């Protein structure tokens, strides 16, 4: 049984999307139980429409919700201990839930998660990992916005955490890792990126296979299982990819409806276009994972549909079922154990 806590008030649509999304996820994963936090007058009428979900859920009333434009510092002051966002995170801290899923304000969610759960031992800064559709299937890209200007040691930490996530999500024994750079040559790039490459190579990590530098187009190609970068460039890459997907979709709709002949052609190629539309559908890969915390936190897009929110729950389910937190902790322990100088006669 996987226990998932939900911030019902998060996102642009709150319980009107989160609850139907939970119902869809429950159909796929009958072994889920939900712990829900939200405003009773908005949530109870919607929850009452889903009998199976109601049976598998415990509802806790919260009168405070965090708005999508609220500053993290303000959200912490106003919502700590009492908001639906805080209490859903706290359920993980208290061991009542295995994972929390929220579509709420990203900055506020990260601030509350860091304050409530704290970062893991030997992790300076957390990262947000995104699941990225590629020509080969899917890959993981991190960081996509949590840590701007990460240094070389933090990038190595991201590689360790991303590798653990790939093993949990894709069930790959030794995932390939690449550092995002302006070229694949060793001499190119910022000093922190070059130093991170050296650190990862010299660490000779058993849990991952370092493939060197990768460029922006390698992300979509699926050249490696995990692409590591700092939060500024990662967030730009993510937003650019999402914008490009929407642009291609708009181009296709325009081209296929412009003339009668185009409409007829579309009918013959409908199967292929439906497959392309599914590949470009952001709801299929919704759910950013906060890595480096003492608990699993999943961030859904704020404007997600019910189907997209269900996809975010799917990610949380997989991460909890496959022991993401334990995998990260074990990899970090192995790495730092190798770094410890020998003690006693061996040190002589």
UniProtKB/Swiss-Prot annotation:
Organism: Rhizobium rhizogenes (strain K84 / ATCC BAA-868)
Annotated metabolic or biological route of this protein: Lipid metabolism; phospholipid metabolism
Class of the enzyme per the UniProt entry, highest EC level: transferase
PANTHER family for this protein: FATTY ACID/PHOSPHOLIPID SYNTHESIS PROTEIN PLSX, PHOSPHATE ACYLTRANSFERASE
Main localization (coarse): cytoplasm
A Pfam family: FA_synthesis
Annotated compartments: Cytoplasm
Function as written in the Swiss-Prot or TrEMBL entry: Catalyzes the reversible formation of acyl-phosphate (acyl-PO(4)) from acyl-[acyl-carrier-protein] (acyl-ACP). This enzyme utilizes acyl-ACP as fatty acyl donor, but not acyl-CoA.
Swiss-Prot/TrEMBL catalytic activity: a fatty acyl-[ACP] + phosphate = an acyl phosphate + holo-[ACP]
Family: Belongs to the PlsX family.
Keywords assigned: Cytoplasm, Lipid biosynthesis, Lipid metabolism, Phospholipid biosynthesis, Phospholipid metabolism, Transferase
GO molecular function terms noted in the UniProt entry: phosphate:acyl-[acyl carrier protein] acyltransferase activity
GO biological process, one term: fatty acid biosynthetic process
Name by which UniProt lists this protein: Phosphate acyltransferase
SUPFAM superfamilies referenced in this protein's UniProt entry, alphabetically: Isocitrate/Isopropylmalate dehydrogenase-like
GO cellular component: cytoplasm
